[in-house]
Amino acid sequence: MKNENIRKVRVNKRDAIDQIRVALWYSHLQHGLDAQLPSEIAKMIEPDKIRVVNGCVTDNDRKWRNYKNGLNVPHPKLIDKAEAVVQGSSLIINHVLWRAMKNSINLNLLLKDGIGKLSWEVQRILYKSSKYNCDRKLVESLSSKKLMQLERLASLDALAALVIFYRMGVEDTSSIVDISRAIYRTLLIICMKKSYSNFSESLILLMHSQVFSLVDPKESILGDSFKEDFLMDLQILMTQFSKMDSEKLITNTWKKDVRISSDFLEKVRFHNLFEELTLMRADTI
């Protein structure tokens, strides 16, 4: 009984990271089920919870409205229920990225257990090449080539890897600049996805408070108006796609879109990032 009480306390406790991961989880379910209202999702995920009392239907609508706003953390059993209906949804809420962003999580533990949960595409970049998997060793640092490879994956897995290496290199100013740039650019590309675009402001605020704030403010890549800067950069990036031939956009895969975005970002000059970088400006291409 005592252990059960402890577990309940942990489930109900939330912070800024929990709020965004739950809201993203809900959004993923919403898109996967093509549902508009919390009550619709409730009926599809928890049909057994629907009750008729005095002629009125109760369907846990309030609980799911709270999930929509990230106000409560769902129980693991409910996450499993949702996964059975919308495959991949549990990967969103339980992603390694959220643990990587929590400074209370031991870095050695992340290196031991977290990286192994990332996709093979990402792990292949992070580990030194070896004939025997049992002898795999992480690279000491991420070269420009590896940073670009991660950026062009533009996934939560790639972002998690970058955050972990950022935490590893907080004492190394030179590597922090490069990794910071890669995190910023990767997050920009990810936020172009429909399921993430509505959370772009929350994600950059979270990245600022949990990751970029680990270094001295003088060494941070973000200025005082970082939120507005990021949203403007995202708008510029989206505008470039709106100028493309609509027929090409329809036939493009996400991988192709990522490469186009990455190429565009590579051409853009940055300022005020260690006196070399700034906001993205399309007129500098």
Language model region names:
Residues E46-D80:
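Recognition helix of helix-turn-helix/homeodomain-like DNA-binding domains
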Residues N94-V122:
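Short, charged recognition helix plus adjacent turn
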Residues M1-D48:
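A short, Lys/Arg-rich alpha-helix, primarily the initiator
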